[in-house]
């Protein structure tokens, strides 16, 4: 009995230990940095996986085109039943020729000797592979941009929530102090009501900010292709990026759109159209093919297969095909030329638009950098004003309205400061995407 009890207890202990271990793991939250978020997204996001699969498909198509240069072999077979024999007339004599049953079978091997259209198709498919690679690069840049801005958005929501929560706790403390003084008869009911209103007015903002944190984290999880229930924390705050803002003011990097993915893709599309035009011109060129046949034939009047006599024969043929006239080829050339002209005009127009957009991002970064510098000083002054208002109220020389006003000014200065850093960072992320900068850890 004791042995059976021992056997029954062991599984229960193991289950309990496993539950404890799982509980410990669940309690450990992932501390996420921007680089980690980007790397997870690049490895798990379906958009990137689809782009990589597209490259593989294009490479397979390219190999299929190259295979057109290799010989092709096929086994053929035919049976012919003569219904009415052919009648021939010679020197006034008529006679019929032909056998009721004819069989033919063998192997045919063909090889393209000169196929200019195939050679142009090979160049076209290679450019198509390059275009797929560039599109995959654009997908990665777009995903990095989305994850980066989502991470900054989450930091902004987190920092805003921290500022509002601290302000709410301070307003609660102010209300507690004012209420205590009111009960002692040292302040008026108006001061008590003002402090309470200030506290309650902040509560909806705190709740909204908390919801904003959850929503921004959820958006980040979706981009990383992670389960929405996963809990994690963000490392750092927007204040940690202040050095990047001031470093951006000092540096004077050359701004160029030569790596822009949109322009690169349009250039490749123009190249493909030009190659397609060259391919269409090859429709006027001759093609030469070599063919080898090794066949067996048999003719019989009956169906006695075991008595059939099969006779082999073989031949080699060289065929030349010269297109003389096909009007569709001329219209195709005209259409392709028009498409090239349209795409080149769109490319020039897009380049001008992107240059304007680049300047807009630079202006936004400069304006945000100036705001960060100004708002940082505003926080220092607002903190001093709040401390003075608090001291004046404590000694009875200030009013609760002045204290509330100072508290609001400090909160607003902190929120504006973090917003300015966020605006700078998002404009910088958009600029890097526009300039075609690849992510480097």
Regions found by a protein language model. Give the residues of each.
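Bacterial Sec-pathway N-terminal export signals of envelope proteins
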Residues: 26-74, 78, 84, 228-271, ...
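N-terminal signal peptide c-region/cleavage motif recognized by signal peptidases
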Residues: 21-23
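Acidic, low-complexity, intrinsically disordered peripheral segments
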Residues: 25-27, 38, 228, 416-441
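Bacterial N-terminal signal peptides that target proteins for export
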Residues: 1-13
């Amino acid at each position: 009995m004791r042995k059976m009890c021992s056997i029954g207890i062991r599984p229960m202990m193991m289950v309990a230990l496993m539950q404890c271990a799982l509980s410990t793991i669940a309690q450990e939250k992932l501390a996420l940095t921007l680089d980690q978020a980007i790397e997870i997204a690049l490895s798990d996001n379906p958009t990137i996986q689809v782009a990589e699969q597209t490259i593989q498909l294009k490479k397979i198509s390219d190999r299929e085109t190259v295979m057109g240069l290799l010989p092709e072999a096929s086994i053929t077979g035919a049976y012919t039943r003569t219904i009415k024999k052919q009648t021939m007339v010679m020197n006034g004599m008529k006679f019929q020729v032909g056998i009721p049953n004819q069989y033919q079978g063998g192997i045919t091997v063909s090889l393209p000797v000169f196929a200019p259209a195939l050679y142009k198709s090979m160049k076209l498919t290679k450019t198509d592979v390059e275009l797929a690679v560039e599109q995959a690069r654009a997908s990665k840049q777009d995903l990095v941009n989305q994850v980066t801005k989502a991470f900054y958005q989450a930091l902004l929501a987190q920092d805003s929530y921290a500022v509002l929560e601290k302000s709410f706790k301070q307003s609660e403390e102010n209300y507690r102090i004012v209420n205590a003084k009111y009960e002692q008869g040292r302040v008026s009911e108006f001061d008590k009501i003002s402090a309470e209103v200030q506290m309650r007015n902040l509560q909806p903002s705190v709740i909204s900010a908390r919801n904003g944190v959850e929503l921004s984290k959820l958006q980040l999880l979706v981009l990383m292709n992670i389960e929405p229930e996963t809990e994690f924390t963000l490392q750092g705050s927007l204040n940690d990026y202040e050095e990047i803002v001031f470093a951006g003011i000092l540096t004077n990097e050359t701004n160029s759109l030569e790596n822009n993915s949109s322009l690169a893709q349009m250039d490749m599309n123009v190249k493909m159209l030009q190659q397609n035009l060259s391919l269409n011109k090859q429709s006027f060129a001759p093609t030469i093919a070599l063919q080898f046949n090794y066949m067996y034939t048999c003719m019989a009047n009956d169906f006695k297969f075991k008595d059939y006599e099969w006779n082999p024969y073989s031949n080699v043929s060289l065929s030349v095909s010269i297109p003389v006239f096909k009007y569709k080829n001329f219209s195709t050339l005209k259409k392709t030329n028009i498409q090239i002209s349209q795409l080149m005009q769109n490319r020039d127009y897009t380049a001008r638009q992107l240059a304007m957009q680049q300047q807009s991002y630079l202006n936004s970064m400069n304006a945000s950098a100036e705001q960060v510098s100004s708002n940082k000083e505003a926080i220092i002054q607002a903190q001093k004003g709040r401390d003075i208002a608090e001291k004046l109220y404590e000694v009875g020389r200030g009013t609760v309205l002045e204290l509330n006003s100072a508290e609001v000014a400090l909160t607003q200065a902190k929120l504006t400061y973090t917003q300015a850093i966020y605006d700078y960072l998002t404009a910088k992320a958009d600029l890097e995407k526009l300039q075609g900068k690849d992510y480097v850890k």
